[in-house]
Amino acid sequence: MDQKQIEEIVRSVMASMGQDVPQPAAPSTQEGAKPQCAVPTVAESCALDLGSAEAKAWIGVENPHRADVLTELRRSTAARVCTGRAGPRPRTQALLRFLADHSRSKDTVLKEVPEEWVKAQGLLEVRSEISDKNLYLTRPDMGRRLSPEAIDALKSQCVMNPDVQVVVSDGLSTDAITANYEEILPPLLAGLKQAGLNVGTPFFVRYGRVKIEDQIGEILGAKVVILLVGERPGLGQSESLSCYAVYSPRVATTVEADRTCISNIHQGGTPPVEAAAVIVDLAKRMLEQKASGINMTR
């Protein structure tokens, strides 16, 4: 699926929902247009906030032959370019920013989604067999299975046999869920209902792994299960969300090739509202073809 097809899908779905089409996240040619790439600076400062846009725009190359080329390159990407060297080693500010981004990534893996936040969204909360974050990181197999209490809660509080079941899980990034939730779940649910699909009760799974959607689909009898889960964070990017969609999942028979994945959902990648429109179209095609993953007709 190319960018033009994605834009057509977004335009069609958002129009049917009566909403404005979101602006694309493509780079602009105007100076300073990308929010993550502020105006480049060359001064090295001990007082600089290492997580700020100014720090990300810092240029560490001393006495460049073509400063304008470095400035344009620095504006064009959020990657670690133009950081300069001190002999064979990175400059102090570049190293400190690397360490700060690494620390931020570790923090988002270890953080918990607050129970108050889940309640504020009006979501039913269930758990996998995991009891704490340490066990979640060391026993991924237990994160693929619901706890007995969770199974009972789904059977008693969720709509059975839906066309589409939407599930939210913390995964490996708490920030991915809390930062993108309001911009992806409401338009996703609205788009699915606008398409005439029977949508199940959305709920939150704490300590969930991707394969847990197979058991959820089997218990609820869902035709399509859509799991929104936090991605493993990269350096300086802790808000990236993934969507794993699967048709008629079964614990014993569903394999990874049966899943369709849309990744890199965040403001600096695929905008959440745009991703919601693409997921709606994907769910419709899965139901039409009765397939997902590599079994879908492209």
Swiss-Prot record:
EC number: 4.3.1.7
Reactions performed catalytically: ethanolamine = acetaldehyde + NH4(+)
Domain of life: Bacteria
InterPro entries documented for this protein: EutC (IPR009246), EutC_C (IPR042251)
Pfam families: EutC (PF05985)
The protein's required cofactors: adenosylcob(III)alamin
GO BP terms, alphabetized: amino acid metabolic process; ethanolamine catabolic process
Gene Ontology terms for molecular function: cobalamin binding; ethanolamine ammonia-lyase activity
Cofactor note: Binds between the large and small subunits.
Keyword Metal-binding: no
Annotated localization: Bacterial microcompartment
Signal peptide residue numbers: none
Pathway: Amine and polyamine degradation; ethanolamine degradation
Principal location: other
Sorted UniProt keywords: Bacterial microcompartment, Cobalamin, Cobalt, Lyase
Residues reported in the UniProt entry to bind adenosylcob(III)alamin: V210, E231, C261
Keyword Cell membrane: no
GO cellular component, one term: ethanolamine degradation polyhedral organelle
Gene3D superfamilies to which the protein is assigned, alphabetical: 6.10.140.690, 6.10.250.2060, Ethanolamine ammonia-lyase light chain (EutC)
Listed PANTHER family: ETHANOLAMINE AMMONIA-LYASE LIGHT CHAIN, ETHANOLAMINE AMMONIA-LYASE SMALL SUBUNIT
HAMAP family according to UniProt: EutC (MF_00601)
Subunit structure: The basic unit is a heterodimer which dimerizes to form tetramers. The heterotetramers trimerize; 6 large subunits form a core ring with 6 small subunits projecting outwards.
Role noted for this protein: Catalyzes the deamination of various vicinal amino-alcohols to oxo compounds. Allows this organism to utilize ethanolamine as the sole source of nitrogen and carbon in the presence of external vitamin B12.
Protein name as catalogued: Ethanolamine ammonia-lyase small subunit
Source organism (scientific name): Salmonella schwarzengrund (strain CVM19633)
